[in-house]
Amino acid sequence: MATAPARRASSSRSSSEISRTTPSMGFQLGFVDDSNVFEWQVTIIGPPETLYDGGYFNAIMSFPQNYPNSPPTVRFTSEMWHPNVYPDGRVCISIHPPGDDPNGYELASERWTPVHTVESIVLSIISMLSSPNDESPANIEAAKDWREKQDEFKKKVRRAVRKSQEML
């Protein structure tokens, strides 16, 4: 369990990161509830010239008490059809807890270190939207569509983009 000074330092770091982001970076950040600095609302703007272009995808970023020593988790609350997003919305990206990947897909150097920032995490997610990794999918059905049924994959992504626009 983190000590009170460690929680304050973690809270201070994350709060300063929220003030440095702008929509021009492809995302917006805000607190879910002003009394809880450990849960953030993230809106990712679909990357231009991708299937997700035009979408506004909401997610919750939850920080552990010992952040930045452990990574936050990210879960889309908007519909998302992507090989690297679990059906429940949890994001699967390579900056997970430190150490070796139990599946052997990534090097320890590609995994979480405390130098990662909220910005680097969100930019990794934006990059993931542009370039799915179907080698180690979180959503098997989306990965199958991506590999074998591109038209079906595109149709499902377009539906998610439309739904995200309707939620504005």
UniProtKB/Swiss-Prot annotation:
Q: Where is the UBC core domain?
A: 6-166
Q: Which domain of life is it from?
A: Eukaryota
**What would be an example GO MF term here?**
ubiquitin conjugating enzyme activity
Gene3D superfamilies attached here? Answer: Ubiquitin Conjugating Enzyme (3.10.110.10)
Enumerate the residue ranges of region (Disordered): 1-21
SMART domains reported in the protein's UniProt record: UBCc
Quickly give the catalysed reaction: S-ubiquitinyl-[E1 ubiquitin-activating enzyme]-L-cysteine + [E2 ubiquitin-conjugating enzyme]-L-cysteine = [E1 ubiquitin-activating enzyme]-L-cysteine + S-ubiquitinyl-[E2 ubiquitin-conjugating enzyme]-L-cysteine
UniProt-listed Enzyme Commission number(s): 2.3.2.23
Presence of the UniProt keyword DNA-binding in the record? no
Q: State a single Pfam family of this protein.
A: UQ_con
Q: Which residues form the active site?
A: 92 (glycyl thioester intermediate)
Query: Which Gene Ontology BP annotations are present?
Result: protein polyubiquitination; ubiquitin-dependent protein catabolic process
Give the UniProt keywords, A-Z: ATP-binding, Nucleotide-binding, Transferase, Ubl conjugation pathway
Q: In which pathway does it act?
A: Protein modification; protein ubiquitination
CDD domains from the entry?
UBCc_UBE2G1
Reported function = Catalyzes the covalent attachment of ubiquitin to other proteins so as to signal them for selective protein degradation. Involved in the formation of multiubiquitin chains.
Family, as annotated: Belongs to the ubiquitin-conjugating enzyme family.
Could you identify this protein by its name? Ubiquitin-conjugating enzyme E2 7
Its organism's taxonomic lineage begins at:
Eukaryota, Viridiplantae, Streptophyta, Embryophyta, Tracheophyta
